[in-house]
UniProtKB/Swiss-Prot annotation:
It comes from Pyropia yezoensis (Susabi-nori). ATP binds at G266, I267, Q268, G269, T270, G271, K272, S273. It is found in: Plastid, Chloroplast. It comes from the Eukaryota. Gene3D superfamilies: 1.10.8.60, P-loop containing nucleotide triphosphate hydrolases. This is Uncharacterized AAA domain-containing protein ycf46. Belongs to the AAA ATPase family. Highly divergent.
């Protein structure tokens, strides 16, 4: 079911109090008044803290700055027809004991009447005492069809002649933005160019990047054709290649369900984060990076709201790649954390979404210490596959040297003895190989000459890799993967 159907069902089932999670107040009001087919006999009352009830014909502005009086108005209104009460700003007062008691009393009364309270909130933090009488649903970001209708409406209102291809491109670029933001960015484009054309697309993408980054939770990386070569990991590459068209219409028509995602487990510096970026580039999809540290930061109760916001943005932007870096740091020691169960609830919401999500969001989670993750995370159905990224073998080290040397010396990389270098750096990660090359370049540059194979050899000999400095952790991770708990990303 979509949002309108969900809301209509809740109203029909006489749910007394509904909290709708959204920042789009105007869009929600429009949906309620038009999509729900509210007739003249069905009254919609709207209240906010500053102006009170703004569409109350008998007393416009009633109950301003008084949320308790706003509830008493609902209680005392005598009307046999369906009445919907939209309460804005009300979520800021939900923890006040007088309002908690009033809402509980009111919920009993309006169950037998044609009254429904809808609280609009962008931060869900329901007091425990109200959990049994309040139902929370999310207003998703506009669908492609909704965005397209708005683009066509705006073009007609502004007397713009847009061809169908441009409309489709603008629509796709606006995916993940609210209707209000779409109107603002279109106005900005008109102010700059006096028209909408192909120059509009980068402006929309930049607007989207800024909006998503302002959440301080997600970072947005638009689709880029940048070549992101990864040395080795042939098994993982083959697995991804088979699924590169999984979000296409042809795949949907074939009956293939959208892939859920990957859990990449491995030693630091083996290419887990680079793999997430490479998937987005190869599959030609935008990339969202979730900062798990910021998910659990802030005030009590905010983590759950942030998780819902992350899900809403990801699904609104889909198809996309959601990259969750170092997920083990967020959920380690989950059952021992003394935060009144917040972490457990956020974790429960997350893994339920992983298992049940229908939107084409491909999750790429990375972990360095798999032992820290709750066992529920590793169950089948959470991710399509768990891959282990080990330290590269000799052939993979040769490939890594070739990639990095060709980046810094695209015309002369062949002069370096890659075979000899790959033999010298046994137990080096890809990141450590890159660092050895950079160190050799610093040495040669300081002496005002070109760096050589010998410089890289010296840098390798001076470098102490993680496999030695954190030997116990590396061997523990290799032993875990060796028991068949994860699929090896490389050919053995």
């Amino acid at each position: 079911m979509n949002f309108t159907q969900d809301l209509r069902l809740l109203l029909k089932s006489r749910y007394p109090i509904i909290v709708i999670n959204t920042r789009e107040e105007d869009r929600l009001e429009y949906i309620i008044k038009h999509s729900l087919n509210c007739s003249n006999s069905q009254q919609v009352y709207s209240w906010d803290f500053v102006d009170g009830y703004t569409n109350n014909p008998s007393d416009n502005g009633y109950a301003k700055r008084n949320p308790l009086l706003a509830l008493e108005f609902i209680e005392n209104l005598n009307n046999e027809s369906l009445n919907l009460f939209l309460l804005k700003d009300f979520d800021s007062f939900l923890n006040e004991i007088v309002l908690i008691r009033k809402l509980r009393n009111l919920a009993k009364i309006i169950k037998t009447q044609s009254k429904h309270i809808i609280i609009i909130s962008c931060k869900i933090n329901i007091p425990f005492a109200l959990n049994d009488i309040i139902t929370v649903i999310d207003l998703p970001l506009p669908s492609l069809l909704e965005i397209k209708k708005e683009i066509i409406r705006l073009s007609k209102a502004l007397n713009l002649n847009l061809n169908s291809e441009l409309v489709n491109n603008i629509t796709k670029s606006c995916q993940g933005l609210s209707i209000d933001r779409i109107r603002k960015v279109i106005t900005k484009i008109i102010a700059q160019y006096n028209q909408i054309d192909s120059r509009s697309l980068p402006i929309i993408i930049e607007e989207k990047r800024q909006i998503i980054n302002q959440t301080h939770l997600l970072e947005f990386y638009p689709y880029s054709k940048v070549n992101r070569d990864i040395g080795g990991l042939d098994v993982l590459k083959q697995w991804l290649q088979k699924r590169s068209r999984s979000f296409s219409k042809q795949s949907l028509n074939y009956g293939i369900p959208s892939p859920k995602g990957l859990l990449l487990v491995g030693i630091q510096g083996t290419g887990k984060s680079l793999t997430a970026k490479a998937i987005a580039s190869d599959w030609m999809l935008p990339l969202l990076r979730l900062d798990m540290g910021k998910l659990f930061g802030g005030l009590v109760g905010e983590s759950e709201s942030k998780m819902r916001e992350m899900i809403n943005i990801s699904e609104g932007l889909s198809p996309c790649i959601l990259w969750i870096d170092e997920i083990d740091k967020a959920f380690s020691g989950l059952h021992s954390q003394g935060d009144s169960g917040t972490s457990a609830r956020v974790f429960g919401t997350f893994i339920t979404w992983l298992s049940e999500k229908k939107a084409p969001v491909f999750v790429v989670a990375t972990a360095n210490k798999i032992q820290s993750l709750p066992s529920e995370m590793l169950r089948k159905g959470r991710f399509d596959e768990i891959f282990f990224l080990d330290l590269p073998n000799r052939q993979e080290r040769e490939s890594i040297f070739k990639i990095h040397l060709s980046k810094v010396r695209p015309r002369s990389w062949q002069k370096y003895d890659i075979h000899e270098l790959s033999l010298l750096c046994n137990k080096f990660s890809g990141a450590e190989i890159e660092q050895a090359i950079i160190e050799s370049m610093h040495t040669a540059f300081s002496e005002e000459r070109e760096f050589s194979t010998e410089d890289i050899k010296i840098a390798i000999k001076q470098f102490v890799p993680l496999a030695f400095t954190d030997k116990e952790q590396v061997e523990s991770l290799q032993a875990w993967a060796g028991d068949g708990r994860a699929r090896n990303a490389s050919l053995t």
